[in-house]
Amino acid sequence: MDFEANEDLNGVRFSWNVFPSSKTDANKNVVPVGCLYTPLKEIEDLQIASYNPVVCAGPQCKAILNPYCAIDPRSSSWTCPICNSRNHLPPQYANMTQENMPIELQQTTVEYITNKPVQIPPIFFFVVDITAEQENLDALKESIITSLSLLPPNALIGFMTYGNVVQLYDLSCDIIERCSVFRGDREYQFDQLVEMLTGQKPSNTMAPLANGKITPLSLNRFFLPLEQVEFKLNQLLESMSPDQWSVPAGHRPLRATGSALNIATLLLQGCYKNVASRIILFASGPGTVAPGLIVNTELKDPIRSHHDIDSDRAPHYKKACKFYNSIAERVAENGHTVDVFAGCYDQVGMSEMKKMTDSTGGVLLLTDAFSTAIFKQSYLRLFSKDEEGYLTMVFNGNLAVKTSKDLKLQGLIGHASAVKKTDATNVSDSEIGIGSTSVWKMSALSPHHTYGIFFEIANPNAVSPITTDRANLAYTQFITQYQHASGTNRVRVTTVANQMLPFGTPAIAASFDQEAAAVLMARIAVFKAETDDGADVIRWLDRTLIKLCQKYADYNKDDPASFRLAPNFSLYPQFTYYLRRSQFLSVFNNSPDETAFYRHIFTREDTTNSLIMIQPTLTSFSMEEDPQPVLLDSISVKPNTILLLDTFFFILIYHGEQIAQWRKAGYQDDPQYADFKALLEEPKVEAAELLVDRFPLPRFIDTEAGGSQARFLLSKLNPSDNYQDMARGGSTIVLTDDVSLQNFMAHLQQVTVSGQP
């Protein structure tokens, strides 16, 4: 099966492409039935229809006309494959012929531009931490000013700064700088905020807010079209200076991050609820003022570590999580998005704030400073545009998953929040990820966003196979509604059909997509790791791997040497091995903020990028051979080669000992050694190609044998040769107590053939 072809066509990859016919049989497969779906995947020759979709009249269905529908031209009707109900075709389909079929009956993925225009343009609310040092703040100002030129002229702009206090700017005033100042140590309620800014009770202000008109007393005066306020905003940004509040020696600055976010989200709730909005937070350090306090101001109090959190010795952690989680729920319900950009060496509290971005489709980016290329380029890539000049980001997304009676939905893992629906009949009682619903809300979406969706086979017990093809197919339809940057409302519809067969049928094993399965299981593991002990999660991964091998490996009992896996299962164990060692589950060397950042990126990427994060790619360059992929293993490190490591988060070029000596001797500058110069350039060219479209921009590392940054490569390698094997010799010795892949596989084979559970 060509799994990637289906992904290119529909943006979908299933763990099993042929489903077992019963729930009992599906449980025997160990790896759940699930898929990775990219709603806005850039599909070649995507068909776009400039009319509203035809919707099934079934009260609990509402599926959309698709190629799997049975069409009866004589009665001008169609039968829905999801609910089997009969529907009338609209009059415009009356002249339909086999040669003149509408695109929705030909293509499994179609995008509709509906006739309902967007009333209010998108809103961008900049929230800037001014406790940064002057150099860092200047770099940030430059990036924000540049980003304004990338926004639509009619976009509504809001601006807020914070340090010890929160300052909300009224951009409607051209003559003087007018702003409202709020205490940073106070958690304002919605009614209080509205009354302070309008002089009226909320019940009196809601009516004028709804019509969108801007008056001197309305809350929406704080959000004005970019074309109207760009000059004023540029003046504000250029005159912005670090917070003047004095910082005693041995203390951190007073930083009211929590209060600023609370006010920003309440303000948008008051005037633009369910309107496309992004709150873009730029943080230069941790919040040191309650609400949302991350760490005390005294530097002698260290910021919490994973060990502190696990041992319940992080005094502010739970309270801060509760505060930011409440903001996350409010923001998601209001259809708004929060982005968090950190520009400092210290942690800023991403671990506490992550739900605000994860539940709304926002960006979480961890960088050392706003002056770094990683921040500058990643931030500007947020505003990337398509071929027609529109922003690739979209707003107010909503994903509904329709299934035929054979399937139920267990849940979704990705950057979304649940839309609670009580009338859905295809919802399972058992949850994986965000469950108990068939509809999820994504306040913001991009072509990068990919969601893991998990299914349960509805039939409880095995059934005898039915001979008709139609009865043996399970249908799934993904309906994504969103607001396009062009000002149109759109609906993208993807419909797929999967064959259902009894357990043990060879076609089920042949349909296993080990790459998609590894990523889906990794998403479950990462989701579990948020609440469960890390060791328990790794034990769960090991048990599922053993059970899968016991079901699908070919072996003789108690004979490890006889162990064999089919080609489409053979890589799955090593994916699990590298996942166990990855920063997603092994958090020993990472801060809580780093872990939050890594997991955030992992749960939004597609199969290919996720696999790079799990098992980085390693390419070897040498004078003797063309560039070629090599094992992620210490045996691949040789004196006469250059290695290119891609972990997704960083790209590293490693020069072997001999290559490094030649480079230091300057051989590349001698025309006689043009081949050597070309060899040095090859990995740089390939690295540059990897950097072009990636978001966020990876860190670039250039190192050599014995260099201090060579540790970034060695930490990712399978330690075939470690200090315990020094007597054997080897290319490079890796100083680690980690189990090697060879020992891991030997133990897996031993346990599998022994029949142990």
Curated annotation (Swiss-Prot):
Highest rank taxon of the organism: Eukaryota
Binding site for Zn(2+): 56, 61, 80, 83
MF-aspect GO terms: GTPase activator activity; zinc ion binding
GO terms, biological process: COPII-coated vesicle cargo loading; intracellular protein transport; positive regulation of ER to Golgi vesicle-mediated transport; positive regulation of protein exit from endoplasmic reticulum; regulation of COPII vesicle coating; reticulophagy
The entry's keywords: Cytoplasm, Cytoplasmic vesicle, Endoplasmic reticulum, ER-Golgi transport, Golgi apparatus, Membrane, Metal-binding, Protein transport, Transport, Zinc
Subunit structure: The COPII coat is composed of at least 5 proteins: the SEC23/24 complex, the SEC13/31 complex, and the protein SAR1.
Record-given protein name: Protein transport protein SEC23-2
Organism: Candida glabrata (strain ATCC 2001 / BCRC 20586 / JCM 3761 / NBRC 0622 / NRRL Y-65 / CBS 138) (Yeast)
Name of the coding gene: SEC232
